[in-house]
């Protein structure tokens, strides 16, 4: 995969590297890549922040590349409060789930469209659920919400459990972690006004993502929970 030509990109994460450089995880339509940004204390370092539309060129054939050029390509998406933690959550999902240098133009486009909506104060939960669902689908982990694992239509009054590698399985007895058929059908229609639909979608996405996150907790989620629990002045 060649990254020599200029590419639209976003910074997912950056950390200091050696004396004046930074090690940066970028997300482009051609995939996720890691590169050394030299002179990170100067203008380039000021640009290399999450949620800022950028254009970049890279050098190098190995997994670790070098940033050859980095320029602003649009208005920064200024995220604050819960929107900021949500943006960090999306970035962490991309770092944890995307294979390196695997082209994902659809995910990139969805990400680029989601950031301005977060910055504009749009309701956060529907945005996160839509992004999680698109990510699962594009990576080949998606499943149907309107039919069960045997191809039968989801029944509104029935109960279902998620088998992450297969789909939704009907169950006869009540147990933890189940989903009402009516909730699943609301998710299929993206009808977030239906009672319980958003809460059920959050549980469903957690169950669907968990096998692919390797058992390690999400740092962004822990940061958000710590913020909620911190006493306020």
Curated annotation (Swiss-Prot):
Keywords: DNA damage, DNA recombination, DNA repair. It holds the Pfam family RecO_C. The keyword DNA damage applies. It comes from the Bacteria. Coiled coil: none annotated. GO terms for biological process: DNA recombination; double-strand break repair. SUPFAM superfamilies: ArfGap/RecO-like zinc finger, Nucleic acid-binding proteins. One of its GO terms (cellular component) is bacterial nucleoid. Belongs to the RecO family. Involved in DNA repair and RecF pathway recombination. This is DNA repair protein RecO. It comes from Pseudomonas aeruginosa (strain UCBPP-PA14). The lineage of its organism: Bacteria, Pseudomonadati, Pseudomonadota, Gammaproteobacteria, Pseudomonadales. The gene is recO.
């Amino acid at each position: 995969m060649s990254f020599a030509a200029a590419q639209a990109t976003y910074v997912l994460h950056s950390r200091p590297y050696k004396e004046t450089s930074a090690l940066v995880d970028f997300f482009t339509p051609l995939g996720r890549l890691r590169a050394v940004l030299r002179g990170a204390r100067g203008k380039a370092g000021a640009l290399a922040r999450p949620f800022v539309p950028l254009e970049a060129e890279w050098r190098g054939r190995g997994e670790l590349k070098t940033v050859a050029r980095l320029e602003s390509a649009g208005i920064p998406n200024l995220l604050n409060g819960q929107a900021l933690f949500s943006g960090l959550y999306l970035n962490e999902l991309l770092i944890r789930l995307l294979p390196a240098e695997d082209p994902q133009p659809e995910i990139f486009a969805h990400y680029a469209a989601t950031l301005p909506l977060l910055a504009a104060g749009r309701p956060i939960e529907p945005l996160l659920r839509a992004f999680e669902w698109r990510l699962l689908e594009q990576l080949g982990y998606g499943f149907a919400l309107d039919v069960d694992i045997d191809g039968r239509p989801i029944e509104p009054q029935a109960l279902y459990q998620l088998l992450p590698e297969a789909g939704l399985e009907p169950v006869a007895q009540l147990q933890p972690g189940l989903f009402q058929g009516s909730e699943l059908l609301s998710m299929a229609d993206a009808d977030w006004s239906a009672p319980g639909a958003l809460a059920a979608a959050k549980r469903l996405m957690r169950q669907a993502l968990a096998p692919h996150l390797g058992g390690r907790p999400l740092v962004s989620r822990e940061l958000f929970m710590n913020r909620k629990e911190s006493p306020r002045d």
